[in-house]
Amino acid sequence: LSKLRLYQAYEQNDTHKVVNINATRLQEVITYADQVTGAALEPDFGNNFLYGYDNGPESIWAAQFSKNDGTLVSRVSFVTGLNSPHGTGLYGCCGFHLASQNMVNAFKTNANGLPLLDTFNQVDIFNVVDGSGKTPLASGVTLDPRIDHTVGIPGRPFKYRNRISNADDMVYNFSWARDPGVYGYFGNMKEQQAPDCSCYVKEGPFVGTSKNIDFIRYADVLLWKAEALIQLNQVSQGLAIINQ
């Protein structure tokens, strides 16, 4: 309900232009968010995206998956598997759900770690493609560290690993992309697991995982509340929540 009320607070006309921000709805956002009890942020942000931490303190609403549960191929998420890197033998098919260049550029920050709201897309995060399939960041570029939980970037460790069997075989490479000329060079990483994870089931070229999919995390609830507070001119309270 908190999420619903936040959408409803931004009242629109027939052309979808916001014409009013409903303070009563915003207050309801806060009220419903405060009713979420017993939850907390994960001590390590990466735990939210790793097998072994399902239904943790930050998980509010999640699709549940399982393996070795007596079914033919287990109740695993093959949807997630369809998004695994397509161009490496470590995974399977099919390399969908990729980050755009615009999205990746949006992770750029200034020297203080704050987002570049107006200028982030003026320069791409890298502008050199080297022969090894990796690339350095463009000069002077700094990134929000959450990008390394989210997107496979050439030359950076994939899923917190450098190696599975051979040196650097888990360092994301241009060759991992399905069709770089069409889809770009970035990989789907947040919802993937390391290929040696016991959570994986392989059926032909497809891989499924028993890792749950979180639809709502406690972090989302906190941000809904923070947005409502800021819109109600309670900026310091909203910022305190954001900076947790």
Give short role names for the model-derived ranges.
Residues 1, 5, 222-225:
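Substrate-binding cleft of carbohydrate-active enzyme catalytic domains
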Residues 3-176:
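An aromatic- and glycine-enriched ligand-binding surface/loop that stacks and positions planar moieties
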Residues 136-244:
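C-terminal substrate/ligand-recognition segments
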